């Protein structure tokens, strides 16, 4: 309830800059012509009606909080979300397929051997693009 009315900006450029990447000309990932979206920290799943944290490495800048307060709160929420029993780490085997509901899962890549090929596919199978984006008007 303490964070139910809070929101944060979400930007690929923000998350990439935190790990040392600099945006290059033409490397906007299709986002350069859009405003940075403001999304709620908590989003209610449209099917289960369960609240879920809507955070991740792209989230920053909670309106009403200082930069330091915003970063500290997001770090605490991420640390909470990424602890057992709320963590699944898949041990990949050839032929594996993993699917998840992006509306209620915080996911990230783990270190892997760059010399070995990886094939990934992203498919939206359900949901309204407007409400799924969680953008606050």
Give, region by region, the residue ranges found by the protein language model:
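Non-heme Fe(II) oxygenase catalytic core, chiefly the N-lobe of the double-stranded beta-helix
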Residues: 1-97, 102-137
């Amino acid at each position: 309830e303490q964070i139910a009315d809070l929101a944060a900006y979400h930007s690929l450029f923000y998350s990439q800059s935190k790990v040392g990447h600099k945006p290059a000309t033409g490397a906007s990932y299709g986002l350069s012509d859009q405003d940075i979206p403001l999304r709620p920290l908590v989003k209610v799943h449209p099917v289960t009606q369960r609240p879920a944290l809507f955070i991740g490495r792209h989230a920053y800048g909670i309106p009403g909080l200082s930069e330091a307060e915003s970063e500290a709160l997001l770090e605490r929420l991420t640390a909470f979300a990424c602890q057992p029993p709320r963590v699944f780490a898949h041990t990949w085997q050839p032929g594996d397929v993993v699917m998840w509901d992006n509306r209620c899962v915080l996911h990230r890549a783990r270190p892997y051997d760059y010399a070995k090929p990886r094939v990934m596919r992203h498919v939206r199978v359900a949901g309204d693009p407007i409400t799924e984006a969680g953008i606050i008007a």
